[in-house]
Amino acid sequence: MDYSTSDLCDHFADVVDVLEPMFINFGGRHSFGGRIKTVKCFENNELIRELLSQDGTDLVLLIDGGGSTRRALIDIELAELALENNWQGIIVYGAVRHVDEIEELDLGIQAIASIPVAADSQGAGEDGIGVNFAGVSFFDDDFIYADSTGIVLSAEELELEIVEI
């Protein structure tokens, strides 16, 4: 479903948190959202691969990469894996690579930067935990909505059908 985060902020100002404006759209789907699954890992994407291998129907993977821009946590292989397993999108507090290929996919991907250097795959990290970045605290099963204007978070699913676009 396409929507505008600006309209969501107008209609749901009392129930949404707005992330600080630091994210860039890299995926081919510019409006995406869903229930979040959290993962925290630093310059290492093995746990990300494990999560994206699971069914992601109506889910957005929210990655706390510590804001590191030294190594890309998402590459074309992981983005294609997410698409194959029906993930709505990925939000990375960190970097991505293979940007030209990723923008061709019908998948929402936002991150703070791109870099050609790959992440390690040592298996370190935690999933299903609360994380905090961009001025907001995130928990598994919160709802996130993203577009080219910004990203908003809600503890409950928003009734998008009442918003006129």
Curated annotation (Swiss-Prot):
It is found in: Cytoplasm. InterPro entries: RraA, RraA/RraA-like, RraA/RraA-like_sf, RraA_gpbac. Keywords: Cytoplasm. Pfam families: RraA-like. GO terms for molecular function: endoribonuclease inhibitor activity; enzyme binding. Gene3D superfamilies: Ribonuclease E inhibitor RraA/RraA-like. Transmembrane segments: none annotated. One of its GO terms (biological process) is regulation of RNA metabolic process. One of its GO terms (cellular component) is cytoplasm. Homotrimer. Binds to both RNA-binding sites in the C-terminal region of Rne and to RhlB. HAMAP family: RraA (MF_00471). Belongs to the RraA family. Globally modulates RNA abundance by binding to RNase E (Rne) and regulating its endonucleolytic activity. Can modulate Rne action in a substrate-dependent manner by altering the composition of the degradosome. Modulates RNA-binding and helicase activities of the degradosome. This is Regulator of ribonuclease activity A. It comes from Pseudoalteromonas translucida (strain TAC 125). The gene is rraA.
